[in-house]
Amino acid sequence: MRGGGFVQIFKDFSNWSTVAVVPHVANANNKISRIFWIAIFLFVLGMFAYELYILIAKFFSYPATVNTEILFEKQIFPVVTVCNMNPYKYSVVKSNSAFSSVNTLMTTYSDATVGTFSTDKWGLYADNDETYDLDSRAADALVLEANLISDTAKVPALYTYADLIQDCSFAGIPCSESDFTKFIDPVYGACYSFNEDASLNYSVSREGIQFGLKLMLTVTQTKTNGNTDSLPTTKLAGARIGVNSRGSSPGLDSNGIDAGVGYESAVSVSLTQNVRAKKPYGTCVDREPDSSDYYKDFIYTLETCFNGCKQRDTIAKCQCANPRLALGSTDTACQPIKADLDCLQTLKGNQTSSTPNIDLLVECNCNPPCDESTYTPTVSLAQFPSTSYYVATSSTAGVGSCSSTNSKFSSKSDCQKWYNNNGMIIQVFLETLSYELYTETAGYTVSNVINDLGGQAGLWLGLSVISVVEMTGLMLVMGAFCVTGGAIKMAPDDDEIENDHRIKDVEDVKKEIDHLEKKHGEMESGSDGEVDDIENKGDEEKKKK
């Protein structure tokens, strides 16, 4: 009985279902027609299953899309960091006992460059036939030697704000030392960051060079008396410039801009913001795990992650940390000895050999930050000062203006020449107030799946919301039938049909109708006979006459 009940349920469903093909299968007149419609149903069902698989696979691949917006609004001015490429005053290095090892290094390097061969603890003479190798090793040795000197002991040899920055203005308004944050870089010595302090509120609502930061710098490779004050290992005369968002690492050693003496360097910057999607739609992270984060004081960037990875690689291979990069609280810095310098040199790798440098993209497992602001610089140069321009500055603590009252120079032309060899102007400004915002979002959501699923179901099976309701009703009826154990009858049995008064009433009505039709037929037959008798009688009377 239960099997028959299910059959009856499906028969009823096929009669009123809106699902494509199902009514055709149920109401087919012959076997061939039914087989044909079953084949059609299986085909469209298979196509729907294939499309469903594609939709599910696409959803679980978690694709992402990038929305691009061009925004135009008032912007916070970026942090601008300036450092002297010459980290320490050579005059102090030669006279201050705290720098005795650095002074010995400078003397040894100078001897090596002119071919005076001897032995040394840094290995400057060993296997350094190329000038580049000698310069690179001497620069690394200087960083290691300076790392052994405390920040307090370094102060006499560092360039003060007054030594480095002769003049400062922002949008034409003078700025001062209080607008800068000082820090000591392991490579460039004392550096000064403008607008780094969160209490400052330098922002711009107009673009162009007139509404940016203007600095006059003096790197003092020679003093005003003509004595050289630049270390022998300093190759370039100028400043290292960094432009970054507040809270980010300046990245001077890898991402800085070189600005040379005797020029005005105009640095126009444009802002780009990236908002990336987190897992599963993206790979961005907010921070590294604390156990491996060397740059906890800075906003996370790919650069900080790569630097931390390089530091871990250095510690693993050299058993010491490179002072050029951030050190952990328990790390031991490499010593200024040949063995450690040799190890650091090997980590740089020979990119043309089978032992290249560490592959940061493969070996470091660094992911981009979820929220990132970057400034793209464009630099243009012009000679400074011009042949007829005599430098004027409001500063009285530094070298001062090229005026006749300046006792540091014998003439205005000598002052001009000194600035040409030691001075420079830096101008940093926003190229435009518009900036690009890239927002990464989920590219295929549940809503998209439902929309596409509805389209495919309608195309291949003719399904709609009504069809879903019908199939839901079918499931409920089948469930109720199973729960009641077949007690719910899907069709009446023979006894119920025989005793159903409604059916009997219908049969009685049918019999009565048949009887009336028979009587009506007999009456019509009788009427035709009477008409014939009347016609015959009329004919006989005519004959008699």
Curated annotation (Swiss-Prot):
Activity regulation details: Inhibited by the diuretic drug amiloride.
Short motif GAS motif, span: 462-464
Basic and acidic residues bias spans: 514-523, 534-545
UniProt membrane topology term: Multi-pass membrane protein
Entry GO terms, CC: plasma membrane
Keyword Transmembrane helix: yes
Catalytic activity: Na(+)(in) = Na(+)(out)
Transmembrane segments: 35-55, 458-478
Cell membrane as UniProt keyword: yes
Subunit organization: Can form homotrimers. Heterotrimer; forms functional heterotrimers producing channel with different properties.
Family recorded in the similarity comment: Belongs to the amiloride-sensitive sodium channel (TC 1.A.6) family.
PANTHER family associated with the record: AMILORIDE-SENSITIVE SODIUM CHANNEL-RELATED, DEGENERIN-LIKE PROTEIN ASIC-2
Protein name (record): Degenerin-like protein asic-2
Organism ancestry: Eukaryota, Metazoa, Ecdysozoa, Nematoda, Chromadorea
